[in-house]
Amino acid sequence: MRSDIVKKGYQRAPHRSLLRATGLKDEDFNKPFIGIANSYIDIIPGHFFLNRYAQIIKEEIRAAGGVPFEFNTIGVDDGIAMGHSGMLYSLPSRELIADSIETMMNAHSLDAMICIPNCDKIVPGMLMGALRVNVPTIFVSGGPMKAGKLEDGTILDLNSAFEAVGAFAEGKISEKRLHEIECNACPGGGSCSGMFTANSMNTLCEAMGVALPGNGTILALSKEREELLRKAARRIVEIALDERKTEQFRFRNILNKKAVHNAFVVDMAMGGSTNTILHMLAIAKEAEVDFNLDSINAIASQVAHIAKIAPALSTIHMEDINRAGGVSAVMNEVAKRNASLGSHSADSILYLDALTITGETLGERIANAQIVDSSVIRHNENAYSPVGGLKILYGNLAREGAVLKVAAVAESMKEFEGSAVCFNSQEEAIKGIAGGKVKAGNVVVIRYEGPKGGPGMQEMLTPTSLIMGMGLGESVALITDGRFSGATRGGCIGHISPEAAEGGLIALIEDGDKIAISVSKGTLELLVDSKIIESRRTQWKPIKKEIKSKWLKRYSLLVSNAANGAVLKTEI
C-alpha cells in the first residue's frame, strides 16, 4: 500500500505514535488509509450539511475495512460573492483547492480518496487535484437543491431572485413580490437547482466515470443520496484492498482523453454552463490531454441538444431530470445517434468502452437506462436542436475563441448587430445598466474582467440578470472577457480571448461601434475599418487596476487566458 511509507517498519515508530494519538490501533496499520476530501462550509447552501455526509462515509469505510481520514478544502459561494469584489476570488479558489488536495494526499501518502464537492469551483478544483495525486478516487457530490415554488405555483430557482431585482428596479413587480421570490427561490440544502455550474460539473463527473450513476441528479438530503455515499465508500475500500484494482483504477486511468471527450458530449446534450468549457479545458491540461476549443465545436456539431434545463427552460430542474431517467438516460439516447469522430465506435459519438470507477465500461453502465419522461429528456428525433447547447465563436474580436450558451439564447438574438456601450469593469456596467445607459439594440461590452485583467474573471450574473429583468433580454447582447454564472441566459458571450489586459481587440472598442454576432457562422466581429483599429492600437494604454491582495497579484502574474482554461503557468 502507498500508505506503508508512513506506517510500516521500525523507522516509522514515531509516525505510528502520532497516528495512535488520533485513535488508531495495531490492526489499523494493516488497512488502507482513505482520504476524505470534504468541502463542508456553513455559508454555502450546497455544503452546510456535508459534515454529516462525511460521517456516513467514514462509518462505511470503517465497516468495509479501511481507515478514513477527513480533511477539508475552502470554497466560495458564487451567488453570495456575486456583484462585488468577492467575485475576484471565485475562480482563483479553484487553484487553491487543487493545491490543497495535492498537498494533503501526498504529504500523508494516503492510498485512495473520496471527494465530497458540490458547488461551483470546488468540483473542478478537486478533479484537478485528484489528477495530480493519481490514486483511486470516487466523487460523490452533495446533490442538487429542490426547485422553489410560490403559492401561485410559479417555479423558482436562484436565477429567479437575480432577475427579480431587475424587474423590481423597472417597477414591474412589487417589493412584496420581490420578497416572496427571495424567500422561496432556494428552499433548502443543495447545489442551485438548475443546470448551473455546480450541477453541470457534477453531471459531467458521471459522464467521465469518476462518480456513481445519479451523482448529478439525486436530490441533496435524500435517502437515495445517502445510499450513494455508502456505495461510494464501500467501493473505494474494495479497490484499495486489492493491489491489482488499485493500479487499474488510478484516477488518470479513468479521467483520460476518452473521459474528457465524453464529458463534452454530455455537456452539449444537456446545455451545460459556459463555465464547464473553462473548467474542462483546465482538467484536460491536468490530465495531459490535448483538447482545444476547435475540438469542442466538432463535438457540438454532432450532438443533439435533448435536455433543456433552467435557466434555458425555467420549469425544468435537476429533480425533473432525475425523475425522467437521469444522466444515464441522456447518455443512452445520445449513444443511439450515429456519428463518427476519432477512433471510437462508429455507431456512437460517446466512447462506450471508457472505464468507470465501478469497473463497468460506460456502455455497460448506461445499457439499460431509459427515458421515462420524454417531455423532460427528449429523444434524438425530437431534440430541441440538432446541435449541442454550447458554441465557440471566432472572429476579429475573439481570435482565440469566445463561448456562448446557445441553448439559452432566443432565436431573435442568434443573428444580431448592435452598437457598443463600453464599460471597463463589472461595477461600471452594473451602474450603467441600472442607470438606463443601455437601450434596445445595444451590445454591452464589459472588459478588463478576464483572468489577468480582473483579476479573477468575475461572473456577470448581476448585469445579465438586470438586462433580463428589465425586459431587454431579446434586444440587447452582452460580450465580455469575463465569464458568466451557469444561471445566465440570453445573448451573452464570454471568455473572449485574447482578453483586454493582454491587448485583445475588445480593449479597442468604442461606444457606438457596430458589433455583429452570428451563431450560424460562429462569428463575433467588430465592424470597424482595420485602419481605424490600427490607429486606436497605437494610442492604446492598458488599464491597470490596483491590486492590493498579494494572492490576486500572484494570480494575475501567473494565470493564462480563458482559451487555455485560466490555469496557472508553472514557468514565467
UniProtKB/Swiss-Prot annotation:
Keywords annotated in UniProt: 2Fe-2S, Amino-acid biosynthesis, Branched-chain amino acid biosynthesis, Iron, Iron-sulfur, Lyase, Magnesium, Metal-binding
What reaction gets catalysed by this protein? (2R)-2,3-dihydroxy-3-methylbutanoate = 3-methyl-2-oxobutanoate + H2O; (2R,3R)-2,3-dihydroxy-3-methylpentanoate = (S)-3-methyl-2-oxopentanoate + H2O
Instruction: Write out the catalytic residues in the record.
Output: S485
Quote any Pfam family the record assigns.
Answer: ILV_EDD_C
The record's EC number reads 4.2.1.9
- Residues that span the membrane, as ranges: none
Q: Which domain of life is it from?
A: Bacteria
Q: Which residues bind [2Fe-2S] cluster?
A: C119, C192
Instruction: State if Lipid metabolism is listed as a keyword.
Output: no
NCBIfam families for the chain: ilvD, PRK00911.1
Question: What quaternary structure, including any partners, is listed in this protein's UniProt entry?
Answer: Homodimer.
Quote the HAMAP family the UniProt record gives.
Answer: IlvD
Family assignment from sequence similarity? Belongs to the IlvD/Edd family.
Described purpose of this protein according to its UniProt entry: Functions in the biosynthesis of branched-chain amino acids. Catalyzes the dehydration of (2R,3R)-2,3-dihydroxy-3-methylpentanoate (2,3-dihydroxy-3-methylvalerate) into 2-oxo-3-methylpentanoate (2-oxo-3-methylvalerate) and of (2R)-2,3-dihydroxy-3-methylbutanoate (2,3-dihydroxyisovalerate) into 2-oxo-3-methylbutanoate (2-oxoisovalerate), the penultimate precursor to L-isoleucine and L-valine, respectively.
Identification of the protein by name: Dihydroxy-acid dehydratase
Q: Which organism is it from?
A: Helicobacter hepaticus (strain ATCC 51449 / 3B1)
